[in-house]
């Protein structure tokens, strides 16, 4: 059994219209939400063995803040395929993960991330900023992941929930 954690990046700023979309920073609320989520995941024992993030600044910063506050010690892998990604892009990223990893966190963007979750768990999903979906997959090899419904949604962790 594998566990997949799908995390939408935290609240990002649109204050500077000159910034490229990939370079948008987190708002103060986004930083706090990411810290809080990391602490909650640590306390619950839901810490990934691997984090893979989009290369966009807001996703990278979300991943690093969550990682720091859940005491994740490894390097965060960056994958440009997770920026403006389709559900199929997510499938390919996950399928490339080593089977040595049992719990993987993907940090990305909507609409692709929510669409991926919807297809995997056969639900209507719309992840808000800094929401994390925890899902179980009924196999032991990441390469077995297909785009069709096969996952069981365990929990959605909402950024606004308190410790």
Question: What is each of the regions a protein language model found here?
Answer:
Residues 44-46, 97-102:
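Glycine-rich phosphate-binding loop signature in dinucleotide/nucleotide-binding domains
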Residues 3, 7-80, 85, 89, ...:
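Active-site-proximal alpha-helix that buttresses catalytic centers in soluble enzyme cores
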Residues 16, 116, 145:
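Residues that scaffold the ATP/ADP-binding catalytic core of kinase and kinase-like folds
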